[in-house]
């Protein structure tokens, strides 16, 4: 079960650099894609880089909204799969066993199996980043996290709270449960 997180703590869901699953709802179709480049730039503002050639890029550009879903380590297969096929060609929710659930503030769905969610609306006027990607700045409209996994920050001693981190190619790491002394 998810609990609502105050927006002033929304940045703490992705401040440590986890891989995210970005969901959209565009022209009557839901979609999900893997995003490694998402970061907070303020308590309730995020920056997300999406390849300009992706179906998800068009969906975000046209609808102005998305959800950043934070997967736990148990979703590595879905993370890899959603990053390897186009949502234009298939229903990735069905193909990779993900459950769409209604978001509170945007039309894009949340992913039930994910441990955290940031519902976002694009701030108009984003600029090109290099030639192949676009940077979207978005305001977080709602934030939620799985009960028991987050206090003032992620409870990394809890194995289910350990997030995935992209190391390059198909290599991923998992957030450790050890805290520095």
Task: Give the role of each language-model region.
Residues 1-181:
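Basic, polyanion-binding surface patches
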């Amino acid at each position: 079960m998810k609990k609502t997180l105050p927006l002033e703590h929304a940045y703490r869901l992705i401040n440590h650099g986890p891989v995210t699953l970005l969901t959209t709802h565009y022209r009557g179709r839901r979609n999900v894609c893997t995003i490694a480049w998402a970061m907070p730039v303020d308590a309730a503002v995020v920056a997300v880089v999406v390849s300009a050639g992706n179906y998800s890029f068009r969906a975000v550009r046209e609808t102005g909204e998305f959800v950043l879903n934070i997967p736990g380590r148990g979703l590595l297969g879905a993370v890899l799969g959603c990053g390897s096929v186009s949502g234009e060609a298939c229903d990735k929710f069905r193909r990779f066993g993900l459950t769409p659930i209604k978001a509170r503030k945007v039309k894009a769905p949340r992913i039930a199996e994910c441990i955290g969610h940031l519902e976002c609306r694009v701030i108009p006027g984003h600029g090109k980043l290099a030639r192949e990607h676009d940077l979207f700045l978005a305001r977080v409209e709602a934030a939620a996290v799985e009960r028991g996994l987050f206090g003032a920050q992620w409870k990394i001693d809890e194995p289910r709270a350990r997030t995935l981190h992209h190391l390059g190619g198909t290599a991923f790491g998992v957030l450790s449960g050890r805290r520095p002394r």
